[in-house]
Amino acid sequence: MPLLDSFAVDHTRMQAPAVRVAKTMNTPHGDTITVFDLRFCVPNKEVMPEKGIHTLEHLFAGFMRDHLNGNGVEIIDISPMGCRTGFYMSLIGTPDEQRVADAWKAAMADVLKVQDQNQIPELNVYQCGTWQMHSLNEAQEIARHILDCDIRVNNNTELALPKEKLQELHI
């Protein structure tokens, strides 16, 4: 099995909250797709609660589009990481990390403005696979944490696992 890009970086050295360009690729038509690692928690030290990350998934996708789409950028998808330490965001375009960080902070401020669980988009049995597994309070705690911190930049070159370490890990 090929080594995926997300496993070629040293998770013991990642900062959070932080933005990282996880991957860029070009489509056959010449569009650039950029995948961002939006790291909310320090890997192996912190984790977002399942109800909070699920609620945040419903809110974050729309709020990030409100603040980032336009000027050559269109978000394709924002999805939580299985490890519950962040989200991956795929988009068309090449915004710099600061633009992404600013949109992220604005989206977190929007999460804090949601006053009632009934305002969570697509929170029903028809549009959500686990519609009862939500917590607005937990999502807002996550948002407060991001707003209380500086969003940094994680750099792939600085985080790259050395070839020796990859060999040691049998990868």
Swiss-Prot record:
Pfam family, one: LuxS
Cofactor or coenzyme needed: Fe cation
Protein EC: 4.4.1.21
A molecular function GO annotation: iron ion binding
EC supergroup of this enzyme: lyase
Gene Ontology annotations of biological process type: quorum sensing
Keyword set includes Iron: yes
SUBUNIT field: Homodimer.
Protein name: S-ribosylhomocysteine lyase
Organism ancestry: Bacteria, Pseudomonadati, Pseudomonadota, Gammaproteobacteria, Enterobacterales
Gene from which the chain derives: luxS
